[in-house]
């Protein structure tokens, strides 16, 4: 979102403040496959090797919630016309279209439970959802307060995860004729 809005890593951290007010949720319509990749950073005398992990072939629905509708609309516009290229972890991992399904008036939990699935799978029994809560969740430190290479900083939020049972064929009711 910050890249889409044109916020640079070394910009004033105050530019991130409106984004820290967003409530965030994710539904994993397709969990994907964990891909292990390694990177070599060449130093003067030695090369550092690091391992990174990515999800391949995953499909997620992301919901943002805010009391500030104009903020959501500006984010939606920026995601459709980003200042900087959008990618997920690596520049070789761009998100697929559509990126924005619209700005709606529902809360994140309702959106995660009612939006049509982005990946159809007749054998799926449930999907995992993760969403921000004000109490009764697990603490995670992933709210970006600064993207600076020298002073990267993250704040805390509370999230809850649950499995959502999927009605694999809501149009077909075998017992409706009995």
Describe the function of each predicted region.
Residues 2-43:
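Glycine/small-residue-rich interface belts in oligomeric ring/scaffold proteins
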Residues 27-178:
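Internal, well-folded beta-alpha domain core
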């Amino acid at each position: 979102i910050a890249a889409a809005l044109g916020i640079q890593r070394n910009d004033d951290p105050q530019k991130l403040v409106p984004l820290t007010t967003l409530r965030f949720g994710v539904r994993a319509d397709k969990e994907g496959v964990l891909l292990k990749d390694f990177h070599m950073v060449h130093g003067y005398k030695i090369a550092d090797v690091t391992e990174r992990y990515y999800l391949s072939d995953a499909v997620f629905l992301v919901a943002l919630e805010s009391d500030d509708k104009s903020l959501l609309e500006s984010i939606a516009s920026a995601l459709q016309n980003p200042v900087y290229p959008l990618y997920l972890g690596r520049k070789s991992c761009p998100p697929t279209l559509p990126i924005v399904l619209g700005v709606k008036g529902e809360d994140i939990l309702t959106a995660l439970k009612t939006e049509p699935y982005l990946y159809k799978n007749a054998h799926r029994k449930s999907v995992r959802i993760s969403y921000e809560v004000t109490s009764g969740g697990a603490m995670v430190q992933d709210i970006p307060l600064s993207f600076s290479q020298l002073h990267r900083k993250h704040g805390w939020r509370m999230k809850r995860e649950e499995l959502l049972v999927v009605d694999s064929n809501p149009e077909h009711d075998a017992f409706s004729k009995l």
